[in-house]
UniProtKB/Swiss-Prot annotation:
Region annotation (Disordered) ranges: 575-605
One example GO MF annotation: unfolded protein binding
Residues with PTM Phosphothreonine: T173
Gene3D superfamilies membership: 1.20.1270.10, 3.30.420.40, Actin, Chain A, domain 4, Substrate Binding Domain Of DNAk, Chain A, domain 1
Bias kind Acidic residues: ranges: 593-605
HAMAP family reported for this sequence: DnaK (MF_00332)
Listed name of the protein: Chaperone protein DnaK
Record's compositionally biased regions (Low complexity): 575-584
Repeat among keywords: no
Length: 605
């Protein structure tokens, strides 16, 4: 049975972990980093993922960042004349994580637990699951990020009862969840959040400030210059991180622009106080969901035993101060905010595989679910913060006489009117026998599985006719599209493998040419001239093949040269052996003479 890996698929960074010998371990990427930037780039037909993609983002407009913000929408990325969905881009990141997890474990990996923000709706969860499938992973479970963090924190504290608040501020999303821990049960009491608030927004306020200051000084708007903007983004992110440890930082961007007098440089000092002033409204925005979650759970700040901080953005001192002030407790610093979610996902993988015993995870649905009823009203069937998996039925009837079909419009959200909520899907129940309005009885049942994915069915109780759907949002992919994308992803992986093989082959060939030249120099005058000429010709043939694109030709010429060099080496060794033998026999004669002299000396004595 292959191992189940845990993946934190983040907006800015992703992380992968696995359970080994009962202990969760974060798997480092090929560069040695424990997290991998969620960045994909395309360059000359080649695909770059992670650190290498992030490094060249400034100069390459075909670089995609923060794709997670578009999951569950019909957003498309146009690159080199081809269209990509957010699911495909996310799948490329997942494929990369999968590949280095396989290299680390030394076996194929096909199963994963992937985390999502607790506040992700059904379309976003479905898109994440599809991304996993495209990457060649069987997604065993979609788990909420704060819940995963609580699992990682609480696994070794199962004997104590406590109420914990997980404050998760990532690169692009914000979640807060309140959980009760006790006797191995992790029960989510309430969850709230904002899917469009995160570290990217903190970077943005610094960028806006730098653009504004530069405009005041030089009259040039840097936000119109794509390359300057990418440099500003990198500088803003760096400044934000530095201000978590120091009180002020220097931002220096030489040659950021130019006017008629020559090049212009951006030199600025940013203090922590100024950054806090610029981002105060963002910090305050995170407090709304905190209060909402407490209210939904029926708790006061005094009832919270521990505050767990998750996500790189929680390193910002103003964020820590705000949550401390709100809850009245110092946040717990015992977990790594960048890795804890992936570790929790790996533990959940262990629970599914049966390697972790006595752990029960009870999560909740973040948003209410229901259908549109007469007058455009949103009628809730399942309230938010209901423990999942769950099922709920309600009986509805027709709105007009002799109505033979009903449209079921499935929605998710908290607003009273249907139009203000998120449409998850629509389907129709037909062939209802004509009857006066109010007579037919139509039972609508909602099921939410452990992944938070919704299944709905409607049944006419008179005829027992039933119609059901697993929600596929307007942005959802059809089975054909998923299969096509899986095939493309496999082909890309194959192309990547071939490209890697080609690079390795070219390197080996280069190295062989170098060693052959060295060997031929050493062999001058020691072996037959015809043999040297043969090796020289084979070497030149390989050099010529390297200039071409025919991989099989390079391989054949490399093997031919290797054979010639081997034969040369054998001949060299044979000659060396003959010489050594000749010297040995000469030496033996000399030895006899020496012995004789030595004996004579003895006799004289």
């Amino acid at each position: 049975m292959s191992k189940i890996i845990g993946i934190d698929l983040g907006t800015t960074n992703s992380c992968v972990a696995v359970l080994e010998g009962g202990e969760p371990k974060v798997i480092p990427n090929p560069e040695g980093g424990r997290t991998t930037p969620s960045v994909v780039a395309f360059k000359n037909g080649e695909r770059l993922v992670g650190e290498v993609a992030k490094r060249q983002a400034i100069t390459n407009p075909n670089t995609i960042i923060s794709i997670k913000r578009h999951m569950g929408t019909d957003y498309k990325v146009q690159i080199e004349g081809k269209e990509y969905t957010p699911q495909q881009i996310s799948a490329m990141i997942l494929q990369y994580l999968k590949s280095y997890a396989e290299a680390y474990l030394g076996e194929p990996v096909t199963r994963a637990v992937i985390t999502v923000p607790a506040y992700f709706n059904d379309a976003q969860r479905q898109a994440t699951k599809d991304a996993g499938r495209i990457a060649g992973l069987e997604v065993e479970r979609i788990i909420n990020e704060p819940t995963a963090a609580a699992l990682a924190y609480g696994l070794d504290k199962m004997d104590e009862d406590q109420t914990i608040l997980v404050y998760d501020l990532g690169g692009g999303t914000f979640d807060v969840s309140i959980l009760e821990l006790g006797d191995g049960v992790f029960e989510v009491k309430a969850t709230a959040g904002d899917n469009h608030l995160g570290g990217d927004d903190f970077d943005q306020v610094i960028i806006d400030y730098l653009v504004e200051e530069f405009k005041k000084e030089h009259g040039i708007d840097l936000s119109k210059d794509k390359m300057a903007l990418q440099r500003l983004k990198d500088a803003a992110e760096k400044a934000k991180k530095e201000l978590s440890g120091v009180m002020q930082t220097q931002i220096s961007l030489p040659f950021i622009s130019a006017n008629e007098n020559g090049p212009l440089h951006l030199e600025m000092t940013l203090t922590r106080a100024k950054f806090e002033e610029l981002s105060a409204h963002l910090v305050e925005r995170t407090m709304g969901p905190v209060r909402q979650a407490l209210k939904d759970a029926g708790l006061t700040p005094a009832d919270i035993d521990k505050v767990i901080l998750v996500g790189g953005s929680t390193r910002i001192p103003a964020v820590q101060e705000a949550i401390k002030k709100e809850i009245g407790k110092e946040p717990h610093k015992g977990v790594n905010p960048d890795e804890v979610v992936a570790i929790g996902a790996a533990i959940q993988g262990g629970v599914i595989a049966g390697d972790v015993k006595d752990v029960v995870l009870l999560d909740v649905t973040p948003l209410s679910l229901g259908i549109e009823t007469m007058g455009g009203v949103f009628t809730k069937l399942i309230e938010r913060n209901t423990t999942i998996p769950t099922s709920k039925s309600q009986i509805f009837t027709t709105a007009a006489d002799n109505q033979t079909a009903v449209d079921i419009h499935v929605l998710q959200g908290e607003r009273p009117m249907a139009a203000d909520n998120k449409t998850l899907g629509r389907f129709q129940l037909t062939d209802i026998p004509p009857a006066p309005r109010g007579v037919p009885q139509i039972e609508v049942t909602f099921d939410i599985d452990a992944n938070g994915i919704v299944h709905v069915r409607a049944k006419d109780l008179g005829t027992n006719k039933e119609q059901s759907i697993t929600i596929k949002s307007s942005s959802g992919l059809s089975e054909e599209e998923i299969q096509r994308m899986i095939k493309e992803a496999e082909e890309n992986a194959e192309a990547d493998r071939k490209r890697k093989e080609e690079v390795e082959l070219r390197n080996e060939a280069d190295h062989l040419i170098f060693t052959t030249e060295k060997t031929l120099k050493e062999l001058e005058g020691k072996v037959d001239e015809a043999d040297v000429k043969k090796a020289q010709e084979a070497k030149d043939a390989l050099k010529a093949a390297l200039d071409g694109k025919d991989i099989e030709d390079i391989r054949a010429k490399k093997n031919a040269l290797q054979e010639v060099v081997q034969q040369l080496s054998v001949k060299l060794y044979e000659q060396a052996a003959k010489q050594a033998q000749a010297q040995q026999s000469e030496g033996k004669k000399d030895d006899n003479v020496v012995d004789a002299e030595f004996e004579e000396v003895k006799e004289d004595k």
